[in-house]
């Protein structure tokens, strides 16, 4: 099918994913030049006409967060001034999503500020994945398509563990992730356990109690993101000590900063299954990490939006067999 007035552009943060999405759709990536002045100012130039086109920009606001965010805002401004018919932001990873409320006095709500900036710059629609705080959708006055990674993760584990007859249990690493873990458990028709943790300070977690039976079972931990990997590795080690035969971990966003890789490699985790919402450079790779691609899902979402068809079937998506 021809998509002559549909264009997909990629900036600096996730070019490999954008190429996969373009291939799935059957189009070429749009031509854009991204550079910087000698003083560090970001410069963006669109190298082809976009007049009257429905444009999708794929850019995760991952590390370096501020540079990638500015690239995106500047690109949007250029598209708006170049008379694009619509500007659709594909933001696989929404940076600043953890700053979604005032936890203490005199703190900002930066995720709301980012939402304001995206809308002022000209966004007509946002497509994103597994927001750290789902209520961020309410910060926008434009359509937000909030896609889930759990169907992809569930299909992987269904083929790897469930089909082999393994006795599994899905585990939430904290109370806040129970809803996410319950969805995965429902997909896999597996029981659910919960880890009660107390966090004495930022990026430090202490395991207090495990609710549910994990002895003699293969456990699957799921979280929206893994940053320094303190929470997930402590959880895995605790599950192993309580008699789990194997511990698998999974997340949508593999931030993997600081000591994350070392902690994962030295932990009880057998495999960590992640999605490619964030590019994974060589120094963040490990034999324990399995990366699944969201390209097929994103391509389907873009086509459905362009053709004005519902996105609800995507929440039942099955993983393409070549990724298994």
Swiss-Prot record:
Subcellular location: Cytoplasm
Pfam families given in the database record: Pribosyl_synth (PF14572), Pribosyltran_N (PF13793)
Keyword Cell inner membrane among UniProt keywords: no
GO BP annotation list: 5-phosphoribose 1-diphosphate biosynthetic process; purine nucleotide biosynthetic process; ribonucleoside monophosphate biosynthetic process
Xref: InterPro entries: PRib_PP_synth_CS, Pribosyltran_N, PRibTrfase_dom, PRTase-like, Rib-P_diPkinase, Rib-P_diPkinase_bac
SUPFAM superfamilies: PRTase-like
Protein residues bound to D-ribose 5-phosphate: 199, 223, 227-231
Pathway: Metabolic intermediate biosynthesis; 5-phospho-alpha-D-ribose 1-diphosphate biosynthesis; 5-phospho-alpha-D-ribose 1-diphosphate from D-ribose 5-phosphate (route I): step 1/1
Residues that, per the record, bind Mg(2+) 1: 132
Catalytic activity: D-ribose 5-phosphate + ATP = 5-phospho-alpha-D-ribose 1-diphosphate + AMP + H(+)
Keywords: ATP-binding, Cytoplasm, Kinase, Magnesium, Metal-binding, Nucleotide biosynthesis, Nucleotide-binding, Transferase
GO molecular function: ATP binding; kinase activity; magnesium ion binding; ribose phosphate diphosphokinase activity
Domain of life of the organism encoding this protein: Bacteria
Cofactor(s) in the UniProt record: Mg(2+)
Active site (catalytic residues): 197
Enzyme Commission identifier(s): 2.7.6.1
SMART domains according to UniProt: Pribosyltran_N (SM01400)
Residues the record lists as binding Mg(2+) 2: 174
Gene Ontology CC entries for this record: cytoplasm; ribose phosphate diphosphokinase complex
Subunit and interaction comment: Homohexamer.
NCBIfam families in the cross-refs: PRK01259.1, PRK02269.1, ribP_PPkin
UniProt record similarity statement: Belongs to the ribose-phosphate pyrophosphokinase family. Class I subfamily.
Function: Involved in the biosynthesis of the central metabolite phospho-alpha-D-ribosyl-1-pyrophosphate (PRPP) via the transfer of pyrophosphoryl group from ATP to 1-hydroxyl of ribose-5-phosphate (Rib-5-P).
Protein name: Ribose-phosphate pyrophosphokinase 1
Lineage summary: Bacteria, Bacillati, Bacillota, Bacilli, Lactobacillales
Gene: prs1
């Amino acid at each position: 099918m021809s998509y002559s007035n549909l264009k997909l552009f990629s900036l600096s943060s996730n070019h490999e994913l954008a190429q996969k999405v373009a291939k799935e759709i059957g189009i070429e990536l749009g031509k854009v030049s991204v550079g910087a002045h000698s003083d560090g100012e970001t410069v963006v130039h669109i190298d082809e006409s976009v007049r009257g086109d429905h444009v999708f920009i794929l850019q995760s606001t991952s590390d370096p967060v501020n540079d990638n965010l500015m690239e995106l805002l500047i690109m949007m401004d250029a598209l708006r001034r170049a008379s694009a018919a619509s500007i659709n932001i594909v933001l696989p990873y929404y940076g600043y999503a953890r700053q979604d409320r005032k936890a203490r006095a005199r703190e900002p709500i930066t995720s709301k500020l980012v939402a304001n900036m995206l809308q002022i710059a000209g966004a007509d629609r946002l497509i994103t994945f597994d927001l750290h705080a789902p209520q961020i959708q309410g910060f926008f006055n434009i359509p937000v398509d909030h896609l889930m990674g759990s169907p992809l993760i569930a299909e992987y584990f269904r083929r790897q563990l469930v089909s082999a007859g393994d006795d599994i249990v899905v585990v939430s690493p904290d109370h806040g992730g129970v809803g996410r873990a319950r969805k995965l458990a429902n997909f896999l028709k597996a029981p659910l356990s919960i880890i009660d943790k107390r966090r004495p300070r930022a990026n430090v977690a202490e395991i207090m109690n495990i609710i549910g039976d994990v002895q003699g079972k293969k456990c699957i931990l799921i979280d929206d993101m893994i940053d320094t990997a303190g929470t997930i590795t402590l959880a895995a080690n605790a599950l192993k000590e309580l008699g789990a035969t194997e511990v698998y971990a999974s997340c949508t966003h593999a931030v993997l900063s600081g000591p994350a890789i070392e902690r994962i490699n030295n932990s009880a985790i057998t495999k960590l299954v992640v999605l490619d919402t964030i590019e994974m450079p060589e120094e963040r790779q490990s034999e324990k990490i399995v990366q699944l691609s969201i390209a097929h899902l994103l391509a389907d979402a873009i086509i459905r939006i362009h053709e004005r068809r519902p996105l609800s079937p995507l929440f039942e998506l099955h993983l393409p067999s070549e990724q298994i």
